[in-house]
Amino acid sequence: MKVRASVKPICKDCKIIKRHQIVRVICKTQKHKQRQG
């Protein structure tokens, strides 16, 4: 899980979702998991 100021999809499997005012990237590649904060 990376915590970043700007979250961007890295590959075509990355999905941006908003969960309780937190922007997240979920992906089947575990390295691509990100959270804004």
From Swiss-Prot:
SUPFAM superfamilies: Ribosomal protein L36. One of its GO terms (molecular function) is structural constituent of ribosome. One of its GO terms (biological process) is translation. The keyword Ribonucleoprotein applies. Transmembrane segments: none annotated. One of its GO terms (cellular component) is ribonucleoprotein complex. PROSITE patterns: RIBOSOMAL_L36. The keyword Ribosomal protein applies. Pfam families: Ribosomal_L36. It comes from the Bacteria. Keywords: Ribonucleoprotein, Ribosomal protein. Belongs to the bacterial ribosomal protein bL36 family. This is Large ribosomal subunit protein bL36. It comes from Mycoplasma pneumoniae (strain ATCC 29342 / M129 / Subtype 1). The lineage of its organism: Bacteria, Bacillati, Mycoplasmatota, Mycoplasmoidales, Mycoplasmoidaceae. The gene is rpmJ.
